[in-house]
């Protein structure tokens, strides 16, 4: 099976060819939005982090933002920061350059003399980058180049018996063609983790699947919380789901039946192809964000009661 895509120099294949206007901190998000609104062919993302945070959270922010830039749906990147943030715009741009040969430029609002001057410079840079991106044509690519994130949200009683098994069948077909799929939301494995773990390609992967579920419950317990107080959600209950076990047993169907080749931390880049699992929160926005940062170029999203969740960089197919 073949499809038309944008072949990158690192061998990855995108289904879009965006120029990304990327804030390095919350303070620059609005400026990035203004720039993207003025240049056709660009996309921006909104973040509320990037400064005044602990080391682990700062590292997570850097991993997500770098992952967005490295995604095969992105041709090039215009980074904008404030100039005094923890995740510095120059450092972020340098990190992207070290990991990729995509065109990257960066601007600091304080250094350039304010948002208006920064936006003007960024618009000029983005227009030049879009012009270069327009010269790249789609080429015929193999199905083994597909990287599909699989998500569910707003689930109801039909999700586990209809849409999720249907998408699971799709996941198996992509696997058989040599492509890659990724499933996340660890809390929605709980109660069915023993079933999912049987798909582990090795005993180590089996144990990793069990461990991420146990770690999630322990993390909540340290704060005196239980995931069962938030799962199923009110939306799920109205739709007919009564317990976390019922929800999880339906949830894992969307990942298919093929062996799981790797378990990844949140927003990490995979080292293997095949069926992957990413350890993320059970929140659509976080999980889709993390999987796209991990490299997924398409998101297939099942929903029973409906949800508008999408993503700026990857098409989300409901």
Regions found by a protein language model. Give the residues of each.
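Metallocofactor- and cofactor-centric catalytic cores in central/energy metabolism, strongly enriched
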Residues: 1-151, 155-298, 302-318
């Amino acid at each position: 099976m073949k499809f038309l895509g944008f072949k990158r120099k690192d061998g990855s294949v995108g289904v879009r060819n965006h120029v990304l206007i990327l804030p390095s901190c919350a303070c620059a998000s609005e400026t990035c939005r203004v720039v993207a609104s003025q240049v056709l062919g660009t996309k921006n993302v909104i973040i509320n982090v990037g400064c005044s945070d602990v080391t682990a959270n700062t590292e997570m922010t850097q991993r997500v933002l770098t992952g967005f830039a490295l995604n095969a749906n992105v041709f090039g990147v215009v980074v904008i920061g404030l100039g005094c943030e923890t995740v510095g715009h120059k450092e972020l741009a340098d990190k992207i350059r070290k990991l990729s040969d995509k065109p990257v430029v960066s601007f600091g609002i304080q250094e350039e003399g304010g948002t208006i001057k920064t936006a003007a410079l960024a618009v000029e840079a983005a227009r030049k980058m879009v012009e270069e991106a327009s010269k790249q044509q789609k080429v015929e690519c193999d199905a083994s180049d597909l990287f599909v994130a699989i998500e569910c949200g707003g689930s109801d009683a039909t999700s586990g018996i209809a849409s999720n098994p249907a998408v699971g069948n799709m996941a198996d077909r992509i696997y058989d063609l040599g492509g890659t799929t990724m499933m996340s939301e660890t809390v929605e494995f709980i109660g069915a983790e023993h079933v999912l773990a049987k798909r582990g390609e090795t005993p180590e992967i089996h144990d990793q699947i069990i461990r991420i579920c146990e770690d999630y419950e322990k993390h909540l317990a340290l704060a005196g919380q239980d995931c069962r107080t938030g799962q199923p959600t009110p939306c799920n209950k109205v739709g007919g789901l009564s317990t976390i076990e019922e929800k999880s047993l339906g949830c894992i169907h969307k990942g298919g039946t093929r062996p799981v080749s790797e378990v990844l931390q949140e927003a990490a880049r995979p080292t293997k192809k095949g069926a992957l699992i990413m350890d993320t929160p059970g929140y659509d926005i976080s999980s889709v964000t993390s999987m796209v940062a991990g490299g997924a170029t398409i998101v297939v999203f099942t929903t029973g009661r409906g949800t508008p969740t999408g993503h700026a960089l990857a098409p989300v197919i409901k």
